[in-house]
Amino acid sequence: MNAVDLRAKSVEELNAELVSLLREQFNLRMQAATGQLQQTHNLKAVRRDIARVKTVLTEKAGA
């Protein structure tokens, strides 16, 4: 997910994307806690995607 793609989305779409990413992060964390997560790099990728979405939302709020 690129920041350029995110900037093209509306605030409502970004909020929906954020909720989706937070749910995915929760599921990955539960898998990691129970020892079922094989691809641990996904946790880092989702965390950074959440940060990107929040950054773009902040930019749009200021503009």
Swiss-Prot record:
Which controlled-vocabulary keywords does the entry list? Ribonucleoprotein, Ribosomal protein
Q: Which NCBIfam families does the entry mention?
A: L29
Query: Per the record's keyword annotation, is Repeat included, yes or no?
Result: no
Family label: Belongs to the universal ribosomal protein uL29 family.
Taxonomic placement: Bacteria, Pseudomonadati, Pseudomonadota, Gammaproteobacteria, Vibrionales
Name of the molecule in the record: Large ribosomal subunit protein uL29
Gene Ontology terms, cellular component aspect? cytosolic large ribosomal subunit
**Keyword set includes Repeat:** no
| Single GO biological process annotation from the record | translation
UniProt-recorded Gene Ontology molecular function terms: structural constituent of ribosome
